[in-house]
Amino acid sequence: MQIIKTTIATFTAIAFTGAASFTSAEVVPLDRVVAVVDNRAITQTELDSRVQDVQVRSQAAGMRLPEADILNKQIIDQLISETLQLEMADRYGVQVSDQEVNASIGNIIQNAQMTEQQFVQQLASEGVSINEFRASIRRQLTMRSITEGLVSRRIRISEQEVDNFLKSADAQFWVSPDYHLGHILVALPSSPSSEAIVEAEEKANALYEKLKAGANFAEVAIAESNGPSALQGGDLGWRKSAELPTLFAELLPSLNNGDVTKPTRSQAGFHIIKLYESRGGQKQIVNQTRARHILVKTSEILNDAKAEAKLKDIRQQILDGADFAELAKTHSEDIGSRMSGGDLGWATPGTFVPAFEKTMAETKEGEISQPFKSRFGWHIMKVEERREEDMTQEALRQKARNMIMSRRFEDETQIWLQELRDEAFIDIKI
């Protein structure tokens, strides 16, 4: 930023005149600039901090690092990419709320299986304060937000692409349901006699009756099963439908969680299957909400207090009889919905940012929310109506779109970052 350049220039002037003006004072080394990206400086302190972070993580993972000059080059390259992303985030007014930062840190603490106090102590042992860590998380969330937003816009997925994907063998595998199964096998010899078949079937039926009476499936499997997972209590873990033998896959759609199948014969013997749990493949009935909103963005002129006050005034006008849609056309700064009177259409959970979702869930049909803040600015919202919708087919198609998007996202991100580099002024000084 220009402030950084000015500060550096001022400190440089003092450093050069210091010998004449402050002959008895100790000269404090300046923070060296290692790279300039447009009007932003990347300093030696930033580089050293990132190098130390990489060294600590690599040592913990038992990885060898390259020579220092190669490592520095890699890290400067990464810092340049991050700086370009943050520059774009500033340009588009992306803001990450404290609520989003707190939620992200909460997830990290939960995954680490620590208490908050233990986590803070762990950070301190690594020389990182909680405020520094929060700033790092905010930076990461900001970069993710701008990258996802701008790169996703560049990827166009046609309905024909979705159709073609859903017909592919690859898609049949990934969109098939997942099942957590238990398995008991009463095996048959390779060329069984009639007596052997009858004996195995009788044993399988006896085990089935035992299970129906309440016996523990895992204990029965350990004691009686001839299958490869017997010593794991017959637990096959989570398997996709497309991975299962046809015999199993045909039985499962009619089962509920906790059900046990009657013995079913294959060439290998008689199988008893328990469905512990399933996910995917069922009807997806979702609650949808249709809402309108008015967005007022903050600026140097319009701070939070003024934006909130403006929306309170608009809300009162609506309560006094003014039309929400007409006021949205006049006042809303959401370009996408302004001309439709702030109408956001039917939305499923997860469509909007957390602050928006929370208010939408808490606002009753026909009511107008109090002003609330998201990372986009200040809003008021009117919930028009709610409904339940069978989204099974649409959910399947959306899953396909997401998979196509994820496959193309990384490559498109690299292309986008390279375009940002091509358009930027970059001066690496080491």
UniProtKB/Swiss-Prot annotation:
Signal peptide location: 1-25
Keywords linked to the UniProt accession: Chaperone, Isomerase, Periplasm, Repeat, Rotamase, Signal
Every PpiC domain range: 176-277, 286-385
Pfam families in UniProt: Rotamase, Rotamase_3, SurA_N
EC number: 5.2.1.8
UniProt subcellular location: Periplasm
GO biological process: Gram-negative-bacterium-type cell outer membrane assembly; protein folding; protein stabilization
GO molecular function: peptide binding; peptidyl-prolyl cis-trans isomerase activity; unfolded protein binding
Catalytic activity: [protein]-peptidylproline (omega=180) = [protein]-peptidylproline (omega=0)
Predominant location: periplasm
EC class: isomerase
GO terms for cellular component: outer membrane-bounded periplasmic space
InterPro entries per record: OMP_Chaperone_SurA, PPIase_dom_sf, PPIase_PpiC, PPIase_PpiC_CS, PPIase_SurA, SurA_N, Trigger_fact/SurA_dom_sf
Annotated domain remarks: The PPIase activity resides only in the second parvulin domain. The N-terminal region and the C-terminal tail are necessary and sufficient for the chaperone activity of SurA. The PPIase activity is dispensable for SurA to function as a chaperone. The N-terminal region and the C-terminal tail are also required for porin recognition.
Function: Chaperone involved in the correct folding and assembly of outer membrane proteins. Recognizes specific patterns of aromatic residues and the orientation of their side chains, which are found more frequently in integral outer membrane proteins. May act in both early periplasmic and late outer membrane-associated steps of protein maturation.
Matches recorded under PANTHER family: CHAPERONE SURA (PTHR47637:SF1)
Protein name: Chaperone SurA
Organism expressing this protein natively: Saccharophagus degradans (strain 2-40 / ATCC 43961 / DSM 17024)
Encoding gene per record: surA
